[in-house]
Amino acid sequence: QQESVLRAMFDAQAGAGFSAMKTPIAGTDFMSAGPFYTYDPVPGDVQMKHFSMARDLGPNGVITYIKRARRYGHFVLQAPMDYPPDWMLFNPDTNQDVNPKYYDALARYYLRYLEDYQKNGVFIDYLSLFNEPDVYTKIPYKEITVLLRDHVAPLLEKSGLKTKLMLSEAPDRDDASTNYPVLMDDAGARNYVAVMPYHGYDFKEYSKIGELHRRYPDVPLWMTEVCYAYEAGTPKSFALPRYEFADGDFWGQQIFNDLENYASAWIYWNAVLDEKGGPWSVSYIHGNPDPNIQHPVIIINRETHEVTYTGLYYYLAHFSKFVRPGAVRIETTGNYPGVRVMSFKSPEGKTVSELMNSRKQDVEVAVVENGRTLRLKLPAVSITTAEW
């Protein structure tokens, strides 16, 4: 059933048409193809002579998966890194900071990743230097500024690759609001930043993103990671993964809140996991950060091979299928308790409205634009797309 799952995710006609995806640089806490890894574990290899993409090229590797997925539809890729090779750190046991003497080597590491992916037919649209720098590689933003401005960006520019740079990904909205100005107020660094990405693990501080937009209105904001996870602290009251369709309403609220505060992309962490909310990886140095049981967009049972498309899948699909790249959010006014509406103008000039009914009963509403009225009955706890 793998092909049917890929079609359901990436085909914009027969499926959701997901148009923005996150792919990790080497090892991450959720991997199915063996133990934790980096592309160059050889200590002191500053010229990347031992750099190897072999894991990603295997039959279950990331490159192989991306190529299969792209048979069904195009999507942009953004790539963050949890950890650089351990030998670049001051203290691998605590993931403590990158030694500045290895900044050039780390820049080469990023470039080799981008070049090798492109040689193998996969272009990375956006590079994030670090995933949650306060959580994984513990590197201050003032040092990220130096690394990006003086090492990574000049090398990338010289290479001729068209990959754009993202600011590293903060674990929540408050962290982004507090720390991003350190880099963004540095004129030399800001010139290289194409997107400000952030994660949604606070589940509440949406206004902080609106503040960032008003401060830097020319730089797009992307919500690039969020999930249900026990280790993240929310929630703890029910078993994961979730099979209830009504669960999608929770995620619909998250999407609405982020987009209303000027996010222009929304990416969920972990598209497909098994019935146990895994697999997760164990690193011999970084230890066992799990069991980090999480809720995916799609659940595949390893024993029965049953595929479950969660409520989250369908709510996400309403946006990704109908609000295509290039659409612009337009002002929507009106109020009905328990009902939210958000509208967009497509590149073709069509109006697309997403209407979410969180009430436990059906609701009748009217959508009015330029004297035209569209009357709709919204089922209880549902999302509806109107296009005209």
What residue ranges belong to the model's regions?
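N-terminal catalytic cores of secreted or lumenal carbohydrate-active enzymes
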Residues: 1-124, 146, 150
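Structural recognition of the beta-strand scaffold that forms the well-ordered cores
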Residues: 19-25, 29, 76-80, 125-129, ...
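The substrate-binding groove and active-site-proximal loops of carbohydrate-active enzymes
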Residues: 42-59, 92-107, 131-145, 167-171, ...
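Glycoside hydrolase catalytic-domain groove-lining segments
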Residues: 54-58, 62-64, 143, 154, ...
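Active-site cleft segment of glycoside hydrolase catalytic domains centered on the general acid/base Glu
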Residues: 87-186, 205-214
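Substrate-binding cleft/loops of secretory-pathway carbohydrate-active enzymes
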Residues: 171-194, 230-240, 276-278
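Aromatic/acidic polysaccharide-binding cleft in carbohydrate-active enzymes
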Residues: 220-315, 331-332
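Carbohydrate-binding surface patches
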Residues: 318-322, 331-370, 377, 381
